[in-house]
Amino acid sequence: MHSMRLMAVAAIVALAACSSDKVTSLPAPVVPQATVLTVSGNIAAKVDEFRNLLGPANGGTAGEQTTGRREINWDGAGANPFDNKNDFPAGFFNSNVKAGAVFTTPGTGFRNDSTDFSEVNATYATQFNFFSANKIFAPVGSNQLDQLFQVAGQPTPALTRGFGIVFSDVDLADKTTIEAFAQDGSSLGVFSAPVRSDAGGLSFVGITFDNAIIARVRITLGTGVLGANVNDVSSGGTSDLVVLDNLIYGEPHKAL
């Protein structure tokens, strides 16, 4: 009987050892790979290429569309009452205009500007340029903003397959970026805008995925915050000041 107990104990120990030998770590999750388009200088052709990747323009049509894209250029008449102020509504582009976009910022607001921000700082008049005439955009009190996607005209979380931005006056490499996030909050990658390469000073970066998986993007504009006493590195300052123009993104589809 004693020997049988010893044999049983030995068998259990052997089984436990065998089981521990078979424990393996789970493979790291696979991050989907983006198709990335970048250009600086004469950006028009590359922007059109990106638009074509996403499909036809859906404008401000309310409701989820089967295919296509949305685009914000800041120039519509509906935004005029908010021009050159620091209180542009964060939800304007899903309430006033049904484009499926809502913005947040750690700063104090947003500014839609028709003066190249020269009313903020006179040196900006020659610093920034627009892509689509004539308004440009930036957060107030921060160089960072997030864009969240919703079904056009509805407060329903949505996902998009692609996102691109026109930037103005990128002076430093890898400081002006888009970071895309999935529905679970995981990062889908950080994508840098190229440095300006001509007097116009425009840069573009666009990303697309095979499927609609982007729930949010974080946009970082250079290294500094616009201000009356803050000059760009090209005007004797210490910060790379950047603003944005057109936002182009795939049709937001309801998140499941």
Question: For the regions a protein language model found, what residue spans apply to each?
Answer:
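Surface-exposed, well-ordered secondary-structure segments
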Residues: 26-256
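Bacterial lipoprotein signal-peptidase II cleavage site
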Residues: 19-26
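C-terminal motif of bacterial Sec signal peptides marking the signal peptidase cleavage site
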Residues: 14-17
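Residue-level detector of transmembrane insertion/anchoring sites
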Residues: 9-11, 65
